[in-house]
Amino acid sequence: MWWFQQGLSFLPSALVIWTFATFIFSYITAITLHHVDPALPYISDTGTMPPERCLFGVMLNIAAVLGIATIYVRYKQVHALNPEENLIIKLNKAGLVLGILSCLGLSLVANFQKSALFIVHVCGAVLAFSMGSFYMFVQTILSYQMQPKIHSKQVFWVRLLLVIWCGVSALSMMTCSSILYSSDFGADIVQKLHWNPEDKGYVLHIVTTAAEWSMSFSFFGFFLTYIRDFQKITLRVEANLHGLTLYDTVPCPVTNERTPLLSRDFQ
């Protein structure tokens, strides 16, 4: 059995590979058509103009769905491993909410380009990155709380390093973007897709976009740490029948049917 066939380990793998492919395909298309500059454009700038906008939107929406599925499986796994510890239960619920909000932000970024509805696009980006960062932080705390009985110390330290990486990238991005957009660098800076080294604010722009890409890769690394954990879990769906036919008016006992959800039983 291949590693991705064990449990639900294919979910975080698919999430990272698909999202990375989304960024790369839209980047290559935008560069080929000269819609953006090759030197570190904003990720969403590569999905601003058609036809790459269509590809970016569809693929990023699918990535958001994969993200919600991965976050939900992680929630169920932590809940099953720690059904009675109050602190872990609260943190786990908080992580679920933060993760879903982050995926909602990702979907907003996919569907509302900055050239169409800038405010909605920015709100989606802030939601995706901020809630995603807090989600990583909460999951790292959970990893600390569950070591060494359930989680190894190595997993905790790897996730902690990824959270620090994410935090440094987020701080750099927020600082430089705040200076860039609050300064007088031109009225069209918000919608600007092409930058030259001699343009005012060019250095701030490059630092901001580099931090955005860096932050995204810290997310990729964090979700990849779920692969081994997800090899140890399978979800099942249960169908509860209320009658022998679809027209029974009186409930009668019927044997329920149980099948695996997306994966075979882990042996």
Curated annotation (Swiss-Prot):
Location in the cell: Lysosome membrane; Photoreceptor inner segment; Apical cell membrane
Entry-linked InterPro entries: DRAM/TMEM150_Autophagy_Mod (IPR050911), Frag1/DRAM/Sfk1 (IPR019402)
Record field: transmembrane: 8-28, 53-73, 87-107, 118-138, 160-180, 203-223
Subcellular location, principal: membrane
Keywords: Apoptosis, Autophagy, Cell membrane, Lysosome, Membrane, Transmembrane, Transmembrane helix
GO BP annotation list: apoptotic process; autophagy; cell population proliferation; photoreceptor cell maintenance; regulation of autophagy; retina development in camera-type eye; visual perception
Membrane topology: Multi-pass membrane protein
Coiled coil, from the record: none
Pfam family, one: Frag1
Family: Belongs to the DRAM/TMEM150 family.
Summary of the function given for this chain in its UniProt record: Plays a role in the initiation of autophagy. In the retina, might be involved in the process of photoreceptor cells renewal and recycling to preserve visual function. Induces apoptotic cell death when coexpressed with DRAM1.
Protein name, as recorded: DNA damage-regulated autophagy modulator protein 2
UniProt source species: Rattus norvegicus
